[in-house]
């Protein structure tokens, strides 16, 4: 789990210039240095560890956490760590309605699957050069926008967002649908919009990588706990009876039968 040393080394404490702050973030600000707000890392650590447990427990329950981060500094980390923990992600442009109009998104994903099927079966070779070219361009566009969520069968149970200000549409859609949101909150953010905030720098690459890494580790830990529980249940169900158990059961049945016979005789 994250330590104070990790936070300091990754520059999680550096906020925005003081003129760009959101006054609602005041409780999370330690001070000012060279016109830059400094985030209180004691609070960051506390919120970080609390949120880690929330995300771990969600994964333990089999829930889906959608990773979102489309800006340059976040794209690679979002994809890398979402894949590492087996969760869907959006690291290209957020398409309006990704959540609130998910049925339309599913139709677009279906189009991507159809094009891939046409390529696999050789049907693409039967088209004109122009038709094949247009379909391949469409495939590239669909992969770019939807590749990370193509296996997401329904709405996610939770969102993990890097830069809640930039991803305001995703935040708005999540809030509208009542989907809990986890997000690092820089000093320009509105904490009221985020269910599980972690005060911290959401611009520096190392800071973003730390947030993504910790959330991925929480999910992996939760999944492992889930597997252990399921394996335990299966073992309980499938465990063959021991000879001792059989013997006890026979003795129990005989004793019960004899007791019933005695009662009948007394009547």
Swiss-Prot record:
Sequence intervals crossing the membrane: none
GO CC annotations, alphabetized: cytosolic small ribosomal subunit
Renumbered residue ranges of the record's region Disordered: 225-267
Acidic residues composition-biased segments: 251-267
GO molecular function, one term: structural constituent of ribosome
CDD domains reported in the protein's UniProt record: RPS2
Domain of life: Bacteria
Family annotation (Gene3D superfamilies): Glucose-6-phosphate isomerase like protein, domain 1, Helix hairpin bin
This protein's UniProt keywords: Ribonucleoprotein, Ribosomal protein
Gene Ontology process terms (BP): translation
Record's protein name: Small ribosomal subunit protein uS2
Gene label: rpsB
């Amino acid at each position: 789990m994250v330590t104070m040393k990790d936070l300091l080394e990754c520059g999680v404490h550096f906020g925005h210039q003081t003129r760009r702050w959101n006054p609602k973030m005041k409780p999370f600000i330690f001070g000012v240095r060279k016109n830059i707000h400094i985030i209180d890392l004691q609070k960051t650590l506390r919120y970080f560890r609390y949120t880690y447990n929330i995300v771990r427990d969600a994964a333990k329950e089999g829930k889906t956490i959608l990773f979102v981060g489309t800006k340059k500094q976040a794209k690679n980390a979002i994809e890398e760590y979402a894949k590492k923990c087996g969760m869907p992600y959006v690291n290209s442009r957020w398409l309006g309605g990704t959540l609130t109009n998910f049925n339309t998104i599913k139709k677009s994903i279906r189009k991507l699957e159809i094009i891939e099927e046409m390529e696999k079966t050789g049907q693409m070779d039967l088209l004109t050069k122009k038709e094949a070219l247009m379909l391949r361009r469409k495939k590239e566009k669909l992969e770019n926008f939807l590749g990370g969520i193509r296996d997401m069968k329904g709405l996610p149970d939770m969102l993990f967002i890097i830069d809640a200000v930039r991803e305001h549409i995703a935040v708005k859609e999540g809030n509208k649908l009542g989907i809990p949101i986890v997000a690092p909150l820089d000093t320009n953010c509105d904490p009221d919009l985020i269910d599980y905030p972690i005060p911290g720098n959401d611009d520096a690459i190392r800071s973003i990588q730390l947030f993504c890494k910790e959330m991925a580790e929480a999910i992996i830990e939760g999944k492992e706990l889930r597997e252990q529980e399921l394996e335990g249940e299966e073992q309980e169900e499938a465990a063959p009876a021991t000879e001792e158990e059989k013997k006890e059961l026979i003795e129990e049945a005989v004793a019960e039968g004899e007791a019933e016979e005695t009662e009948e005789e007394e009547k």
